[in-house]
Structure formats: structure tokens, C-alpha cells
């Protein structure tokens, strides 16, 4: 990826390699990068508004779009849209359990939560206690892992879905690729990843305060290729305030999506109307 980028302090970079050399060029710098990221979030209150950076009011629009995306995936990937299956999900960067409570636990019998900030995870335990959930006893938060993504290896073939939202920007490129390569082993046959993230218009934007990087769509696609992952489906998030970064949802699989017969597509098309942070 040769596109340049910008830091929140105004510093310009020719390409990601230049930025990563400066930020995580040796093990000491890399440790400092990750420690600063966790330290930033340790100073944030364990509420939905806190983990959403003061934008707690976007929660409803976020969950609504994510649910539509997930429903389409379940219908495409599993017989009977997964009903009758014992489905298991992993919520990465789970924070206070916002995505699990509002979405995942209504579709997956078990949800594991992965979060490096201990007071967020403790809040999630409370938020996801059985007495605080409006779901049957067959749906539950199963395991709570207080670990960062770069240190986590999932159990083999445990998950039908690994959901990663608003946290992958904390990983350096090499750890991004390593994480997904390990995590692929945690997917069941037919399983998939959902990555939901802020998107830079071009190149990347480095946030010096919380030590994270907002990548462009093309930057992500290059990393997906390095991970050996394929885009099954993607969709833009709608309904967020204009001042926020654009947000995309990517469904990623280890197998190449089947290509629709192009001649059939052409015949059908003739019958259609011609219609930041």
C-alpha cells in the first residue's frame, strides 16, 4: 500500500511503512504502542456512551444496520438461517458488551467476549448477567477473555461468527495479519468474520491519542489478501452524523465466493428498469 497518510498532530507520511517504522519499529516501541492504546481506554468510563466516544446516540442506527447485515449472512451461510443449529460467536473488542447484548446474543447460543480493558469486561459481565437479558436460557455469554487481539488464539473450530468492531485499528499491520491467520482456525466449517470499521477516504489516519489507525477501503483489502480472506459481502453504514468517519461492514470468508453466471446476469439485466472522528 503506497498511499500516504496523516497523523492527528499534522504529521504527514509517505506510506504506511514509514508510519509503522516510526511507531512500532522495534519491540520496545511496539510494546509502548499497545500499552498506550490500552491506557487510553482505561481512562474511559464503562458505559455505552464512553466506549462510543460520546456518541452513544448512534447505537440504535449501528445495531439496526448490523442486524440486517447479519440476518443476510445467516440466511446465505446456514440452512434455515441457522435456526436449529447451536451457533457460537466471538465478540472482539467487546467493550461493555454493547454489541453482544443488543445483537449477537439474540442470534447465537453462546457468545464469548474478548476485551483487553478489565473494567470494560467487568461491566460486560454485569450487563450480560442472565437477569439483565431479554433472551431465553439457551442464549448466554459464555466466556470473558481479558486479552488484546494480538495475544489471543481461539479454540479450534469453535465459532460460527467472529465479530470485530471498532478495535482492529489498534493492531499494527503485521499483528493484523497474524491475528486473522490464527483466528481462521477458530471458525467452524461455514463460519465467517464480520469486520465493522471506520474508513479513511484515502491512505490512513493515525490517531496519536489512542494509538489507532483508520485505514482506507483499499488498505483493508490489501490486508485481507495477505490474510488469505475473501470478501463475501460488504455494506456501508448509513445514518451516522456527518462529522464521523464513514463506516463499512465486511463479511470475510476463507473460501472464494461463488461467481454468478455472467451470461445469466446479462439476460436478467435487460428486464430491469434503468434505474470523521
Map each language-model feature to its residues.
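Class I (Rossmann-like) S-adenosyl-L-methionine-dependent methyltransferase catalytic domain
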Residues: 1-157, 171-182, 189-277
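Hydrophobic adenine-recognition pocket in adenosine-nucleotide-binding enzymes
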Residues: 167
Amino acid at each position: 500500500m503506497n498511499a500516504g497518510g496523516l497523523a492527528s498532530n499534522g504529521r504527514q507520511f509517505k506510506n504506511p511503512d514509514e508510519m509503522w517504522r516510526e511507531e512500532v519499529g522495534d519491540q520496545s516501541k511496539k510494546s509502548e504502542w499497545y500499552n498506550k492504546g490500552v491506557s487510553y481506554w482505561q481512562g474511559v468510563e464503562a458505559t455505552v456512551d464512553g466506549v462510543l466516544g460520546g456518541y452513544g446516540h448512534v447505537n440504535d442506527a449501528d445495531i439496526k444496520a448490523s442486524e440486517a447485515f447479519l440476518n443476510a449472512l445467516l440466511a446465505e451461510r446456514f440452512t434455515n438461517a441457522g435456526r436449529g443449529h447451536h451457533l457460537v460467536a466471538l465478540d472482539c473488542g467487546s467493550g461493555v458488551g454493547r454489541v453482544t447484548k443488543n445483537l449477537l446474543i439474540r442470534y447465537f447460543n453462546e457468545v464469548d467476549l474478548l476485551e483487553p480493558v478489565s473494567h470494560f469486561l467487568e461491566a460486560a459481565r454485569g450487563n450480560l448477567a442472565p437477569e439483565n437479558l431479554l433472551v431465553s436460557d439457551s442464549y448466554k455469554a459464555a466466556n470473558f477473555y481479558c486479552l488484546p487481539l494480538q495475544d489471543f488464539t481461539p479454540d479450534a473450530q469453535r465459532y460460527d461468527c467472529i465479530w470485530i468492531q471498532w478495535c482492529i485499528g489498534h493492531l499494527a499491520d503485521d499483528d493484523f495479519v497474524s491475528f486473522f491467520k490464527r483466528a481462521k482456525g477458530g471458525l467452524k466449517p461455514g463460519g465467517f468474520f464480520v469486520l465493522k470499521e471506520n474508513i479513511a477516504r484515502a491512505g490512513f489516519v493515525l490517531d496519536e491519542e489512542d494509538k489507532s489507525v483508520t485505514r482506507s477501503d483499499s488498505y483493508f483489502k490489501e490486508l485481507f489478501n495477505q490474510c488469505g480472506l475473501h470478501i463475501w459481502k460488504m455494506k456501508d453504514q448509513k445514518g451516522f452524523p456527518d462529522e464521523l468517519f464513514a463506516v463499512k461492514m465486511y463479511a470475510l470468508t476463507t473460501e472464494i465466493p461463488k461467481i454468478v453466471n455472467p451470461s445469466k446476469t446479462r439476460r436478467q439485466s435487460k428486464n430491469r428498469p434503468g434505474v470523521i472522528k
